[in-house]
Design a protein with these regions (language model features):
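N-terminal alpha/beta PP-like core and its mobile active-site loop of ThDP/TPP-dependent enzymes
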Residues: 1-177
Length: 177
């Protein structure tokens, strides 16, 4: 269900609260540049609280060069210098951009998968305005989102591993901190 909010911070915080209550990760679409940074505090809090979320905003990749697209003059000044994904990278789990309209669906699916993997957290996708305006038809077979992998061993796995190590002639265990 689409809910329009008048403020980006409110939208991000509503998505966080809804996810806490229902356990269902949410998607938030915010305005490019200023809207993204307006929601930054909420996005950072979601990252610290390990709340899975997909945050998206758009910018222009043609900067008004295509006369058929309604690109406003603000894009010429670089609403998001270096790309919006660079703005949010320090406070999201992963930040990327959608390369083309046909890849939008799979990019969103992949981002949703990543958001729900441990440690959970918000994922950012920069979806260029040109891709949002392009006509798109879903493929005949859309890939379903697989469940996030288990973050702890299932019953019996630890015992089976211990037995394998005990039975090994020269076991080697490599660990990292």
């Amino acid at each position: 269900e689409y809910i329009q909010c008048w403020h980006e911070t409110l939208a991000v915080n509503m998505a966080t609260g809804y996810t806490w209550i229902t356990g269902q990760a949410q998607a938030v679409l915010v305005h490019a540049g200023v809207g993204l940074l307006q929601g930054a505090m909420g996005i950072r809090c979601a990252m610290q609280a390990e709340v899975p979320m997909l945050v998206m905003s758009g910018e222009s990749v043609t900067l008004g060069a295509d006369e058929d697209l309604p690109i406003e003059p603000q894009w010429y000044g670089g609403v998001s210098p270096g790309g919006a994904d660079k703005l949010v990278a320090p406070f999201v789990k992963w930040a990327s951009h959608v390369p083309s309209a046909p890849t939008l669906y799979q990019c969103i699916i992949r981002a949703g998968e990543m958001a729900q993997r441990a440690p959970m957290g918000p994922i950012y996708l920069d979806v260029p305005l040109e891709h949002m305006l392009e006509d798109w038809s879903p493929a005949g077979e859309l890939r379903q989102v697989p469940p996030a992998p288990a973050t702890q061993a299932a019953n019996g796995e630890i015992e089976a591993l211990a037995a394998d190590i005990a039975a090994a002639k020269n076991p080697v265990i490599v660990t990292e901190i």
